[in-house]
């Protein structure tokens, strides 16, 4: 019984570390210009949702295509940084993540906030819903 209780207590911290690892891998992939590897953090599903700029895009391929168009070269991609990451476990297989993003580019530094819903899938923790907003440029 004690082993079962310990395993249950350890799971949330393991899950948080696994989710943080997904975000770290995404940041690394982005910063080497690899959008396809960045997209490995998202669930490869038609139900994956990305919300930004007053538009909801549905489906992993649609989200990937949006990134490819918007960030078509390394100059547009810049260097990505995440900060103020807060992971809240909703259940043993779901979590919400709140954080900040920032791109450092030659002529600007767009930044904003994001809320992600992660789900534990057979292939590991993946983003199933991403709501990202940019701060005003003022």
What residue spans do the PLM features occupy?
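Hydrophobic residues on conserved beta-strands that form the core of alpha/beta folds
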Residues: 82-84, 98, 127
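Short, well-ordered beta-strand segments in beta-rich or mixed alpha/beta enzyme
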Residues: 26, 48-53, 94-104, 117
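A solvent-exposed, acidic/Ser-Thr-rich amphipathic alpha-helical stretch
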Residues: 35-90, 102, 108-109
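A short, structured loop/turn motif at beta-sheet edges
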Residues: 87-95, 118-124
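Short, low-complexity N-terminal intrinsically disordered segments enriched in polar/charged residues
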Residues: 1-41, 45, 62, 138
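Short beta-strand edge/turn micro-motifs at domain boundaries
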Residues: 111-138
